[in-house]
Design a protein with these regions (language model features):
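Auxiliary alpha/beta "docking" domains used to position bulky ligands
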Residues: 1-187
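Active-site recognition of the HExxH zinc-binding catalytic motif
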Residues: 190
Length: 190
C-alpha cells in the first residue's frame, strides 16, 4: 500500500478544487456487492430497478487492472432549486455544474485527470451528473470515510447532503480513509 501516493492524490484533488478526497481498495466495496445480491434475491421484482447497477457487481472482472477507488466530494452549498423542480428527483443530476463544458468545474476535473496521466496512473471514471458511472458513488464515499448514510439513504458529509460525488478506479494500490464524526440522523428525523 503506497501511503505517499495516497497523500499526493488527496492533495492534488484538493488543489483541483475538490472539497475532500478519500481512497479505498477495490475490496472495500465487497459489502455493497453482497447487499445488492441479497436485495435482488429477496425482492426479485427489483431487478429492473437495479439493472443499471449490474456493472457495479463485476468491477473486478470488468477492470482486472483496478486496485483502488479514488472518491472526491464537491460541496455545492445550500443551493435552492427553482419551484418548478421542487419534489422532483435528479435535480442535481440535471443542473450539475459539471454539465457546463467550459465551466470551472470541468476544467478542474480535467486537470486532476491530466495529473493522473502525468503520474502514469491508469484510471477510469470521473463521471458525475450521469445516471450511472463506473463506481457506485455513495457506497464508495462512505467506505472512504467522507460521509455517512442517514435514514433517507442519502449521503451526508460534514456540511449536509448537498455534495457532488466523483470517483475513479485506479491501477495503484493505496488508501486514504478519513475518520468521520458525523452524527447519525436523530430519532426525530424522517
Amino acid at each position: 500500500m503506497n501511503t505517499l501516493l495516497a497523500q499526493e492524490i488527496h492533495d492534488k484533488a484538493l488543489a483541483c478544487g475538490y472539497d475532500d478526497c478519500g481512497i479505498v481498495p477495490l475490496d472495500a466495496l465487497d459489502f455493497y456487492k453482497e447487499r445488492m445480491i441479497k436485495r435482488l434475491e429477496d425482492v426479485p421484482e427489483s431487478k429492473k430497478v437495479y439493472a443499471h447497477s449490474n456493472a457495479f457487481l463485476t468491477l473486478k472482472e470488468n477492470y482486472p487492472w483496478a486496485q483502488s477507488i479514488v472518491v472526491c466530494t464537491e460541496y455545492f452549498g445550500a443551493y435552492k432549486f427553482p419551484a418548478s423542480l421542487q419534489k422532483r428527483y435528479a435535480k442535481g443530476l440535471l443542473l450539475s455544474l459539471a454539465n457546463i463544458p467550459d465551466g470551472v468545474e470541468v476544467k478542474q476535473r480535467r486537470s486532476f485527470e491530466t495529473w493522473f496521466n502525468d503520474k502514469n496512473i491508469q484510471f477510469i471514471g470521473g463521471e458525475t451528473a450521469k445516471p450511472t458511472g463506473v463506481v457506485p458513488l455513495r457506497p464508495a464515499s462512505v467506505a472512504a470515510g467522507l460521509g455517512i448514510y442517514r435514514k433517507n439513504n442519502f449521503f451526508y458529509g460534514p456540511k449536509g447532503s448537498n455534495y457532488e460525488l466523483v470517483a475513479y478506479l485506479i491501477d495503484k494500490s493505496c488508501e486514504y480513509i478519513h475518520d468521520t464524526d458525523i452524527p447519525p440522523c436523530p430519532d426525530s428525523c424522517n
